[in-house]
Amino acid sequence: MHLPPADVRPNALILSYPVITAGEFAHRGSFRSLTGTDDIAAHQPHSLENLVTPDTPPTFLWHTWTDGAVPVENTLLMAMALHKAGVPAEVHVFPRGGHGVALGNQVTNIPGEEARKIVPEATVWTEMAARFIRQIFTKS
């Protein structure tokens, strides 16, 4: 079954500690998995901050400053690209928390990783994202 791109385009995005860039702050393992190669030149066409257009859906992004897996610069680069393209966006960077914080509470905690995964200040991201989505789709 083939659907036109407009029929499968998301209406909005929620990106949590996302892998965005194939550049200096890349998470190389993700690009290796995506492309099947370690060739950095093959990664570049997939660098999302370079693919943002005014048609990119409104985007909510969040990250933690201390994410040791995916550098926070990924979120910051995407935020700048969205701003430059005039795409509505909301961005939050919480001061601490490792990669995969998820809900930041006991519900999504991995036993033994409480210091990295229990991040009370980040638990509000779901409420913030819901408010952003409501604002995008509420007619004024």
Question: Can you name each region flagged by the protein language model?
Answer:
Residues 1-30, 39-44, 48, 135:
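Primarily recognizes the serine-hydrolase "nucleophile elbow" in alpha/beta-hydrolase
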Residues 9-12, 56-59, 85-90:
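Loop/turn elements at helix/coil->beta-strand transitions in domains of secreted/extracellular proteins
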Residues 16-19, 63-65, 94-97:
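Active-site-proximal beta-strand/loop segments in catalytic clefts of secreted hydrolases
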Residues 22, 66-70:
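Acidic catalytic loop of the alpha/beta-hydrolase fold
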Residues 26, 71-74:
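Residues at alpha-helix caps and immediate loop-helix transition turns in enzyme cores, especially N-
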Residues 55, 60-63, 67:
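Short beta-strand/loop motif that positions the catalytic acidic residue
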Residues 73-140:
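C-terminal catalytic histidine-bearing segment of alpha/beta-hydrolase fold enzymes
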